[in-house]
Amino acid sequence: MAISKVYARSVYDSRGNPTVEVEVTTENGTFRSIVPSGASTGVHEALELRDGDKSKWLGKGVTKAVSNVNDIIAPALLSANVDVKDQKAVDALMLTLDGTPNKSKLGANAILGVSMAVAKAAAAEKKVPLYQHLADLAGSSTTPFVLPVPFLNVLNGGSHAGGALALQEFMIAPTGAESFSEALRMGSEVYHNLKSLTKKRYGASAGNVGDEGGVAPNIQTAEEALDLIVDAIKAAGYEGKIDIALDCASSEFFKDGKYDLDFKNPESDSSKWLSGQELADLYKKLVEKYPIVSIEDPFAEDDWEAWSHFYKNAGVQIVADDLTVTNPTRIATAIQKKAADALLLKVNQIGSLTESIQAAKDSFDATWGVMVSHRSGETEDTFIADLVVGLRTGQIKTGAPARSERLAKLNQLLRIEEELGSKAIYAGKKFHNANKL
């Protein structure tokens, strides 16, 4: 079935910044998607087109991206009469219209909005849930479907928070749960225990939450943060059932070839900055002491040597985000250099659904894991919840069990699990190889 209308408008994300919403209309109705945006963005990412007019929205307007959908993409899609179910053809047409390697002409935010809305329209035409349509597009096995382990960002540092803590995200992963719904209950209980402990130790205001719903107390070191989380896990009664994951976002504190764990202090002492090897030693100590199962972006996005050296004997999942930015060329290099063994999949880093699916497949082919991810500037759109089930990746990170833009995805996964019943299993401790379950 052909598309009868494509329309974009500017709406707001969870940080109050403008973002692009796209509606695609077919005979079956109108289908809508909203594009997220990140705070710590990799230099190799597809371009999110912002207006740059400082007199409106502090330069963050998306009126150009919206116009690109309404004035360029919409007429081209309608005149090409592309079948809404032919995702590859839709995406290829937009990439040709754009013609740049990083989508800088039309904007990844314009292209992705259309790409996701088209997938929703196609699922409706096929009369199947979105996750089933995405599984069809990816060629994923659906016997059984796999529900992901939620990696819940319960404590924030780095660029997402004040305080001196350099590492950006401390996540809990309820790998010992029997189902997704049990995992979310466990995660929620630990989160509440963590908030109480944080207020007791750091004062009432320390319980306030950051962009992704995690607490952001004035913590100085990773050990202090991890001790607090371990205490919360114990208080909730889930020791041994809940693991921990880190997103270090190290590109944010990489300076002159060294890592500055005091990067938020303008007078930071450069004699205390760490080499890649010294930072690797710090991670190894943390892995030995705490139940850490996954480390994302342990080193800067172009510090390939440090990545490859660390991966050899890390013993935990090493997730590439800024290193690969969901970009097929960067993923191929990371695979060849043996720099990591999991991809963080953010659809807006590459900017189209077809390319996102290909990135996941390339990763699976190299026996990598894939973790589907939200962005810090999120919306009520639940697309990635269906995507993680459709791609069968077994792991998702979408913030804390707090703030509606985070819960939207987690609640959608609860619905999917309920709908699938015995046709689905929970990834649990096998999250890294969920595509093979």
UniProtKB/Swiss-Prot annotation:
PROSITE patterns linked to this entry: ENOLASE
Active site residues according to the UniProt entry: E212, K346
Q: Where in the cell is it found?
A: Cytoplasm
**What does the entry give for GO biological process?**
glycolytic process
Q: In which pathway does it act?
A: Carbohydrate degradation; glycolysis; pyruvate from D-glyceraldehyde 3-phosphate: step 4/5
- Annotated Mg(2+) binding lies at D247, E296, D321
Broad enzyme group:
lyase
The keyword Metal-binding is assigned to this record: yes
Q: Which GO terms describe its cellular component?
A: phosphopyruvate hydratase complex
Q: Which Pfam families match?
A: Enolase_C, Enolase_N
| Named cofactor requirement(s) | Mg(2+)
- HAMAP family from the entry? Enolase
Give the family from UniProt. Belongs to the enolase family.
Kindly state the subunit structure of this protein.
Homodimer.
Protein name, per record: Enolase
